[in-house]
């Protein structure tokens, strides 16, 4: 299974863990990355994630988040086709960067795109029939996968 974690997920382990929701999402992201490390799933990402991470003004956090990225073979570069798909997705109400995450995850043939951004998830839910990837919150998705009859 190919898992695309957007930058909100990659940042979650380094966010202030005072709120229960943040702790639970961070734990879910950690367990997902453990499954990736164990070879059960493949982590894919994209050039837009690299751009967003590079824009973080905190060098320590930027370095820590960068360590969570997959190897370069699993990073989708942005192409004219990806940008065109991103523009089409923007017309559905997605922010530009979010649209590019979707376009890149579709290009990578990801099974799921995970995000901690509620607005992004709600917009995706409204547009689900027009997307070629499922977009979910990492905590909800991991719980769903763990309780599936054929859980890995």
Label every model-predicted segment:
Residues 32, 64-65, 101:
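Residues within well-ordered alpha-helices
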Residues 2, 11, 16-26, 91, ...:
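Acidic, PIN/NYN-like endoribonuclease modules and their adjacent C-terminal/linker elements
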Residues 62-87:
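Helix-adjacent hinge/juxtasegments
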Residues 9, 49, 82, 100-101, ...:
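Alpha-helix capping/helix-boundary segments
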Residues 94-96, 100-103, 110:
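Mid-chain, well-packed structural core segment of small domains
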Residues 4-57, 70, 75, 139-144:
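PIN/NYN-family metal-dependent endoribonuclease catalytic core
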Residues 51-55, 94, 118-120:
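Acidic, metal-coordinating catalytic cores used for nucleic-acid/nucleotide bond scission
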Residues 77, 96-99, 115:
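Short beta-strand scaffold positions
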């Amino acid at each position: 299974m190919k898992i695309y974690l957007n930058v909100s997920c990659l940042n979650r382990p380094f966010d202030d863990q005072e709120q229960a929701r943040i702790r639970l999402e961070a734990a879910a992201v950690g367990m997902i990355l453990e499954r990736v490390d164990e070879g059960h799933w493949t982590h894919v990402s994209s050039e837009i994630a690299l751009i967003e991470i590079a824009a973080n003004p905190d060098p320590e956090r930027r370095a820590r988040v960068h360590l969570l990225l997959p190897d370069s073979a699993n990073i989708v570069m942005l192409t004219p086709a990806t940008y065109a798909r991103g523009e089409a997705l923007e017309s559905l109400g997605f922010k530009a960067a979010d649209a590019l995450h979707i376009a890149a995850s579709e290009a990578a043939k990801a099974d799921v795109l995970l995000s901690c951004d509620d607005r992004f998830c709600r917009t995706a839910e409204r547009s689900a029939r027009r997307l070629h990837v499922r977009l979910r919150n990492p905590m909800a998705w991991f719980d769903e996968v763990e309780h599936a009859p054929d859980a890995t």
